[in-house]
């Protein structure tokens, strides 16, 4: 468990999981008032979908096991039911899922601090707890649906809007972005601590899209081009 600072050592988070209907790519973004949100929350595989495991006592095993269930053919709802199972601590946890077919599911335990909840739509799920109010999730969802640019840019716009809408009641300390696709290398960006983590994440994303790093990316193997290399 990470140190949640002044709120009883609770990790509270808002996150978004989404599918790009044009490219088939999956992406997620998250921010929290504690450390290392990327390592705790976001997991994904372009073949199976995404998970976001968060809450007062987040279970990384839930996120990992849900992906395995979706790999085996479970829908998001089936995977959710299976991993929650008989976990006696489930009321302290929150888990959002997005499967390969764009189906979504979310569990929000009742012992997570208000405001807590989720909004679900085909190919999109936003969730959070210890938020300023429901307007945070509405900003996440609505901004993603109206934003322009590629999947990463839309996700960054969404968490920026969520922060402006009130975000996490403690203020934010870390932020992360994950995009997985059969046609591109994974994009995994994390700001594990910053006074302005979303701004820092946006800067890191800009750096990843330019210069020597961006020039190197087309040489890396992908699911659809596994033998790619340097000419």
Question: PLM features: residue spans?
Answer:
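N-terminal nucleophile
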Residues: 2, 8-231
């Amino acid at each position: 468990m990470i140190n949640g600072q002044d709120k009883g050592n609770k990790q509270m988070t808002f996150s978004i999981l989404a599918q790009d209907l044009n490219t088939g790519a999956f992406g997620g973004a998250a921010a929290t008032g504690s450390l290392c949100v990327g390592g705790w929350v976001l997991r994904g595989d372009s073949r199976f979908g995404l998970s976001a495991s968060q809450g007062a006592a987040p279970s990384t095993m839930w996120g990992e096991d849900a992906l395995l269930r979706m790999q085996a053919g479970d829908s998001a709802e089936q995977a959710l039911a299976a991993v929650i199972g008989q976990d006696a601590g489930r009321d302290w946890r929150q888990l959002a899922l997005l499967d390969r077919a764009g189906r979504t599911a979310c569990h929000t335990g009742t012992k997570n601090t208000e405001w807590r909840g989720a909004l679900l739509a085909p190919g999109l799920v936003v969730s959070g707890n210890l938020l300023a109010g429901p307007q945070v999730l509405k900003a996440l969802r609505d901004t993603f649906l109206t934003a322009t640019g590629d999947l990463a840019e839309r996700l960054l716009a969404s968490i920026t809007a969520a922060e402006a809408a009130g975000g996490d009641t403690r203020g934010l300390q870390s932020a992360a972005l994950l995009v997985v696709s059969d046609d591109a290398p994974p994009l995994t960006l994390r700001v594990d601590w910053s006074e302005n983590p979303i701004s820092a994440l946006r800067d890191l994303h800009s750096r990843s899209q330019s210069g020597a790093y961006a020039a190197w990316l087309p040489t890396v193997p992908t699911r659809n081009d596994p033998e790619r290399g340097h000419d």
